[in-house]
Amino acid sequence: MNKLYIGNLSENAAPSDLESIFKDAKIPVSGPFLVKTGYAFVDCPDESWALKAIEALSGKIELHGKPIEVEHSVPKRQRIRKLQIRNIPPHLQWEVLDSLLVQYGVVESCEQVNTDSETAVVNVTYSSKDQARQALDKLNGFQLENFTLKVAYIPDEMAAQQNPLQQPRGRRGLGQRGSSRQGSPGSVSKQKPCDLPLRLLVPTQFVGAIIGKEGATIRNITKQTQSKIDVHRKENAGAAEKSITILSTPEGTSAACKSILEIMHKEAQDIKFTEEIPLKILAHNNFVGRLIGKEGRNLKKIEQDTDTKITISPLQELTLYNPERTITVKGNVETCAKAEEEIMKKIRESYENDIASMNLQAHLIPGLNLNALGLFPPTSGMPPPTSGPPSAMTPPYPQFEQSETETVHLFIPALSVGAIIGKQGQHIKQLSRFAGASIKIAPAEAPDAKVRMVIITGPPEAQFKAQGRIYGKIKEENFVSPKEEVKLEAHIRVPSFAAGRVIGKGGKTVNELQNLSSAEVVVPRDQTPDENDQVVVKITGHFYACQVAQRKIQEILTQVKQHQQQKALQSGPPQSRRK
């Protein structure tokens, strides 16, 4: 994406005019300006320079009295599903952006782009061409917190190479936000092992010492520890701290971290730097609750075992631009290195548990794209579910055949109600918009009630999104112990005449349903039907188990309704003849 389109040019525009504009803006080009009538093309050295040119010049520079337009050059055949959204407010919460994007279709991926500007930039992939076109039309020029969004196509090479019959359906079989297809129909895809990197924050003044003369020091650390180390020194120009990403085995990562700590402490002595140099680890918020532990027990134990003092940045600092929390460890080199081992051990454990949970039962919901639902940290690099070879015809969401509104009563820990509602109701409002569902929390049945009922009303896809986010929030906020799965109870109401079909002869159907979903499914006996002649089915289990059970029960109900309709049609003609 380093080729630029320059539009709104006057007929008198010459290559020398454009050369002068780019030179004044200190933006290099890697080839001549190809000037046509009213527009031109040019290549930048790389994608980051192209983005800088767009942000610095588009709509801000005039040539012969006309403001020039600068965008990525995208051939028509590649203007399909991918958009770049620029000028996003820097402090915007992820969920606000999510809720805005999903208004126009299914978001397969949403990836933040590193940029030097104060505002944020994301690349978004929708599941179809029509959805992307609608998002472009509606969001370009959209006012968001006094910022005007700028939206343009970026090349969609993958979709352009697909069979034309498949393109409009937007079904690519993606298993991960932003990942490419892992194979073709009939092929066997091998899942690449995925490691969780260690991310550090270091004072900018020590970056030179860490890299060393001509990169010698960092190369030496990389070689000795068998690590891949990226020092992000060009990002966030002028920032007091820079991030470092280390990817290796747990042992290699810890060794590299300790080497970097030793270099910083030595450099501090050499330059007579008197301030304390803590170890700062960046971790996605989804893992932090489990690192802290119930009542802070996990963190206290690490502090005691390593003789360090550990603090974590507040939730309020999380923004679209910064989805990570900063874990600050104070101590000497040895104690900080030990603390890093224990902290990352806990974070990796949470990460692996989440992956296992994501993969568990995922094959029972075909084409499930978990990350597009925002149920997993977009920065964590979660691998796709191991559900066999993906198909190009597989949709990115569960294929919900019916769009009828359903009502589910989900019972959550009473202590988690505040987290679900959020400050001044912001979280539950955003969740409702994101899922496209009505979400209400019923009053407590008693002052000392341990659970509260959440009433979720919406079609199947909205149920999936809303329930998934609620499960995730309870896990994230540490309302269950770190090694436990979140298991909630859900109630759905079914017509009393259909309850027998859910149970099956001798309980056969309900037993098969429990074996299939791993959820506990109970149809209480001797229930008195309510005023709508309905009875309750209770489902208890982790998120995927509950979802599979709910969908299977809805399938049974659909079959019962169809059977009734057929009987009514068959009995219709004789009744009319009798009249």
Swiss-Prot record:
InterPro entries: KH_dom (IPR004087), KH_dom_type_1 (IPR004088), KH_dom_type_1_sf (IPR036612), Nucleotide-bd_a/b_plait_sf (IPR012677), RBD_domain_sf (IPR035979), RRM_dom (IPR000504). Residues 2-75, 81-156 form the RRM domain. Residues 160-192 are annotated as: Disordered. One of its GO terms (biological process) is translation. The modification Phosphothreonine is found at T528. One of its GO terms (cellular component) is nucleus. Expressed in fetal liver, fetal lung, fetal kidney, fetal thymus, fetal placenta, fetal follicles of ovary and gonocytes of testis, growing oocytes, spermatogonia and semen (at protein level). Expressed in cervix adenocarcinoma, in testicular, pancreatic and renal-cell carcinomas (at protein level). Expressed ubiquitously during fetal development at 8 and 14 weeks of gestation. Expressed in ovary, testis, brain, placenta, pancreatic cancer tissues and pancreatic cancer cell lines. Residues 195-260, 276-343, 405-470, 487-553 form the KH domain. The modification Phosphoserine is found at S184. Residues 177-187 have a biased composition (Low complexity). GO terms for molecular function: mRNA 3'-UTR binding; mRNA 5'-UTR binding; N6-methyladenosine-containing RNA reader activity; RNA binding; translation regulator activity. It is found in: Nucleus; Cytoplasm; Cytoplasm, P-body; Cytoplasm, Stress granule. Its main location: nucleus. It comes from the Eukaryota. RNA-binding factor that may recruit target transcripts to cytoplasmic protein-RNA complexes (mRNPs). This transcript 'caging' into mRNPs allows mRNA transport and transient storage. It also modulates the rate and location at which target transcripts encounter the translational apparatus and shields them from endonuclease attacks or microRNA-mediated degradation. Preferentially binds to N6-methyladenosine (m6A)-containing mRNAs and increases their stability. Binds to the 3'-UTR of CD44 mRNA and stabilizes it, hence promotes cell adhesion and invadopodia formation in cancer cells. Autoantibodies against IGF2BP3 are detected in sera from some patients with a variety of carcinomas. All KH domains contribute to binding to target mRNA. Domains KH3 and KH4 are the major RNA-binding modules, although KH1 and KH2 also contribute. The KH domains are also required for RNA-dependent homo- and heterooligomerization. The integrity of KH domains seems not to be required for localization to stress granules. Belongs to the RRM IMP/VICKZ family. This is Insulin-like growth factor 2 mRNA-binding protein 3. It comes from Homo sapiens (Human). The gene is IGF2BP3.
